[in-house]
């Protein structure tokens, strides 16, 4: 009986060692984007993302806007009472965005998590590289992506205006980026 249990434990240990990223919190790439931090992993068909800023309000990221926010796939959220609220938005105008669902799209965020510690809000989530949703343009993995970053003040509401925003050009495959 002891040999059987020992054999099972050894087998489980070997399986867990063979899957090193199962509980990994490390990211392939991390950039300090002025007042925010952006970390990500590119997988075969998805992208794991972590964004954070020194705020107790919302934080957000947008992918490949046409101009300002127009046409961007925008993910933003906040943490309230220890629970993350993360939404999938689309840039409907240069200076406006709204939930994908209101436009006829769908929410394409998985693994939503968040924390608010020592005045810093951190969100992590996974998005598909190409969801097929017209309100989530495909994420560019080769070449330069235009990325927008923003965070709001110290209020748990997505209706508040940003206190900080910036636009960067980032090569998501190499991790290189610069302010636009």
Where are these regions (language model features)?
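Positively charged n-region of N-terminal signal peptides that target proteins for export
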Residues: 1-4
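Bacterial N-terminal signal peptides
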Residues: 8-18
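Extracellular-facing/secreted segment signature in eukaryotic proteins
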Residues: 23-180
């Amino acid at each position: 009986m002891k040999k059987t249990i020992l054999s099972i434990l050894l087998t489980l240990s070997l399986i867990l060692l063979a899957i090193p990223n199962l509980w990994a919190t490390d990211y392939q790439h991390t950039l300090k984007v002025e007042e925010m931090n952006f970390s990500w992993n590119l997988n075969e068909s998805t992208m794991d993302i972590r964004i954070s800023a020194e705020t107790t309000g919302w934080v957000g990221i947008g992918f490949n806007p046409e101009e300002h926010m127009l046409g961007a796939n925008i993910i933003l959220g906040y943490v309230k009472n220890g629970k993350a609220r993360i939404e999938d938005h689309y840039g409907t105008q240069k200076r406006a965005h709204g939930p994908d669902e209101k436009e006829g799209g769908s929410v394409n965020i998985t693994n939503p998590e968040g924390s608010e510690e020592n005045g810093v809000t951190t969100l992590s989530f996974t998005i598909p590289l190409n969801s097929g949703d017209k309100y989530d343009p495909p994420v560019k993995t080769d070449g330069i992506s235009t990325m927008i970053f923003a965070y709001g003040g110290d209020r748990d509401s997505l209706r508040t205006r940003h206190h900080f925003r910036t636009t960067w050009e980032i090569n998501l495959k190499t991790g290189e980026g610069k302010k636009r």
